[in-house]
Design a protein with these regions (language model features):
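Conserved AdoMet/S-adenosylmethionine-binding subsite of the radical SAM
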Residues: 83-95, 104-239
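A C-terminal junction/extension of Radical SAM enzymes
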Residues: 240-259
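Short, positively charged and aromatic/hydrophobic N-terminal segments
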Residues: 15-21, 25
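Conserved alpha-helical substructure of the radical SAM core
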Residues: 65-96
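Positively charged N-terminal leader segments that act as targeting/secretion signals
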Residues: 6-7
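Canonical Radical SAM [4Fe-4S] cluster-binding loop centered on the CxxxCxxC motif
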Residues: 24, 42-77
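Short, charged low-complexity linear segments at domain edges
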Residues: 27-46
Length: 259
């Protein structure tokens, strides 16, 4: 079913290459990118993914450096134009993913999600978990159907993994607790980097996050657009070993990005 809908969408996207219109008033959330058709970003749904710019973290292996440290090189896409595109995709797309960067840096993120929900789309939010108050407001308002938190590493190794000495994990821990008690479908996921992650870290993350419905292990891949060069991923066999370590802690454990 997803493949059939995707084929229909691919045929229609040629008419949407120029979604910017002159004279549009910009007074709300701006994105820095729009993936018009995403088949894997939202589990089980065909979606469009909206990328916001800016992030409070500086993970050295981040594959989206343009959205984090070089925003002046990234053109902004006004919210009105994103919504206009989504209006044309009603009945074809199932959902919308708000990703980044870090979406909850955007003061109007909740308002944008409300508009998307009002259009009839399911909503997935990707976040690093650093803004529990904003996450709580979104959850309480029923503005997200699915939330993914990027767990960077064991709590002890967060500072070096996010590139911020002395980083306090308390906000991330609060976001984890919020999701666990929210009743909202969610996942935790970690991008594994050979120079930063060990089997002991995997065990520690499993114990910290245990009881969550699903945990995904993602392999680092060099996008050519990193904040810092010199990082490497693991072999598929090594990642499978990590998955076996955390399997007792979660209902579902899967690998992503393993070709």
């Amino acid at each position: 079913m997803l493949l059939q809908k995707a084929l229909v969408l691919v045929g229609s996207l040629v008419y949407d290459n120029n979604i910017l219109s002159a004279g549009t008033e910009v007074d709300s959330m701006k994105s820095c990118g729009l993936q018009k058709l995403a088949m894997v970003d939202y589990p089980g749904k065909l979606a469009a993914t909206v990328f916001t710019g800016g992030c409070n973290l500086r993970c050295p292996f981040c594959h989206n450096a343009l959205l984090v440290t070089r925003l002046n090189e990234t053109p902004e896409l006004p919210e009105a134009e994103v919504l206009a595109f989504l209006e044309r995709r009603r009945g074809l797309l199932d959902g919308v993913v708000l990703s980044g960067g870090e979406p909850l840096l955007q003061p109007d993120a909740a308002d944008f999600l409300r508009k998307v929900r009002d259009m009839g789309f399911a909503v997935k939010l990707d976040t690093n978990g650093c803004f529990p108050d904003r996450l709580a407001a979104i959850l309480e308002a029923g503005l997200a159907d699915y939330v993914a938190i990027d767990i960077k590493n064991s709590r002890e190794k967060y500072p070096q993994t996010v590139g911020i000495p002395g980083f306090d994990t308390a906000p991330v821990e609060e976001s984890v607790r919020l999701l666990a008690n929210s009743g909202v479908d969610h996942e935790f996921r970690t991008t594994f980097v050979r120079e930063l992650h060990t089997a002991a870290d995997v065990e520690a993350m499993g114990q910290w996050l245990q009881g969550a419905p699903r945990y995904f292990l993602q392999n680092f891949a060099d996008s050519g657009n990193l904040i810092q060069e010199g990082w490497h991923g693991f072999t598929a066999l090594e990642l499978q070993g990590f998955a076996d370590i955390v399997r007792p802690f979660f209902s579902q454990v899967e690998l992503r990005g393993i070709g």
